[in-house]
Amino acid sequence: MAKVLYRVDGPDGASFRVRDNSGVTEISLDSGTTWVAENQISALALATSFVVTTDAATYTVTAANSGKTHIIPNLTADCVLSLPTAAAGLNYRFIYGGNAADAQDWQFNSGSDTNFFIGGLVQHDPDNAGDDTVVYHPDGDSNSKINILTPDGGTWVEFYCDGTNWYVNASVISATDAAVTFADQ
């Protein structure tokens, strides 16, 4: 027989319970009609900790996916990735998930020059004996677009929003000279 170990009732009427069902820890949310084993919850958490973006000319990043890694596949066309409306606490990580250097470009767009980028990106260019490293910075007052040209394996970009502006930190691997550019709307 299952034994309820914990029960927590939230202020809005939502509740969850934890029980021991013959040595298996299970969790139930709200009504308690569906019990989920602890190992299933761990698998679910892993499955939802990342998003694979679509191979399309545009991709809308949602606030609901804040905190998740977005895997960008080898694209068949340049892609504009539109960040959500600025809100404090939003954060995203984007990584390149292709098997070879992408022939396409990424553009991250905040949607407004008032929601400009702060921070910087480093580019490593592997085709000149691997000795080309350049750091890029936005202008700090209006650059609301970041273009990343032909990313390769190891490329990642992180964004953190303070409610108005987007802080960016990134490492771009690309054999394209000047593979990072900034622009206004």
Predicted regions and their residues:
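Residues that act as N-cap/strand-start positions at coil-to-secondary-structure junctions
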Residues: 2, 12, 75-77, 153
